[in-house]
A protein has these predicted regions:
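Alpha-helical membrane-anchoring segments
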Residues: 1-311
């Protein structure tokens, strides 16, 4: 049991949490304007509102212009504060329920985008980690089990996005493995025409290969959680490449999930790396200056020796 507990709560530097806070809270602002951007419009048509399960469970009120406008400005202010790593718990506990409500309203037309799973969970677990107390939060190398638990939750949700997608593909086909051999990508390209996708329509075998690679990758995605070092990096790059291909073929980006892949990245090394580079550059500059002074001294000594010889 202790090994299981240790896996769920690895000791991770607080600096990774600080970087993740800054990036994700700023991304939420982008998300509100680029992806789930019609929440405020839903407040103008309350009669068309169809609450999702969580909204019904918590008996959230029907959105109005006043509610969605308040949500908007509260989220903007709280995200900007949280991104600075000042008052991360207070600001974080404001952002988590506010953005969850924002998403519930925005997706109330029935299209629930599963690419927001990891992002929403990340916003709920980040406030559980205390504020850094040692200098710059982005450089704090203090290792914390609380930080490890938050990071692990985000990682699990990132992977669950793919694995549960594979399960959904099986379930929709009556638990038969027919999805990889279907014409789903062909249908998607026809529905979302794009030059790269249209070129692939002339090579259907490539589409079937891509479907097989995709579903196998989704089923094997949990393996990434146990990989280490470069192997984990390769696993992450595989899925990021998967999204790059989807964007090129279908213009489907999945950015809310992609940005959460940063939970796997050792971002706590960023500041020490820059500091070591700066120190190395300073040492090189000092060495160059010393060499220049030594050359000047040698030139001066040579000139004096010539003058003495001439005398």
């Amino acid at each position: 049991m202790r090994a299981v507990a240790n896996w769920f709560t690895p000791k991770i530097a607080l600096a990774r949490i600080a970087w993740l806070r800054t990036i994700l809270y700023l991304f939420v602002i982008l998300d509100m304007h680029a992806f789930v951007r019609d929440t405020r419009l839903k407040g103008e048509s309350p009669g068309l509102y169809q609450p999702l399960y969580l909204a019904r469970l918590f008996e959230l009120p029907t959105p109005t212009v006043a509610i969605t406008t308040t949500l908007y400005y509260v989220l903007i202010v709280a995200c900007l504060v949280a991104a600075t790593n000042r008052f991360p718990r207070i600001a974080g506990w404001v952002v988590a329920p506010a953005f969850t409500w924002w998403v519930l309203i925005g997706m109330s037309d029935g299209k629930v985008d599963h690419d927001h799973l990891a992002l929403v969970i990340a916003l709920w677990v980040l406030p559980t980690v205390a504020q850094s107390r040692k200098g710059s939060p982005w450089a704090d190398q203090t290792r914390s089990e609380a930080a490890g638990w938050a990071i692990r939750c985000v990682q699990i949700c990132v992977i669950a996005t793919y694995f549960l997608s594979a399960i959904a593909k099986l379930r929709s086909a009556g638990w038969a493995l027919t999805w990889p051999g279907s014409a789903i990508l062909t249908w998607a390209i026809v529905r979302r025409p794009h030059p790269v996708g249209e070129w692939l329509l002339h090579h259907p075998w490539m589409l079937h290969v891509m479907q097989w690679i995709g579903i196998i990758g989704e089923f094997l995605s949990p393996v990434v959680l146990w990989l280490k070092g470069r192997w984990q990096l390769l696993g992450a790059l595989f899925f990021i490449g998967f999204h790059v291909a989807n964007t090129a073929i279908l213009l489907i980006h999945f950015l809310p999930t992609v940005v959460c892949w940063l939970a796997f990245a050792p971002m706590e090394r960023i500041v020490p790396w820059f500091r070591s580079r700066r120190s190395a550059d300073s040492a090189d500059s000092a060495g160059d200056a010393g060499d220049a002074r030594e050359a000047e001294d040698q030139t001066e000594d040579g000139r004096q020796a010539k003058e003495q010889a001439g005398a």
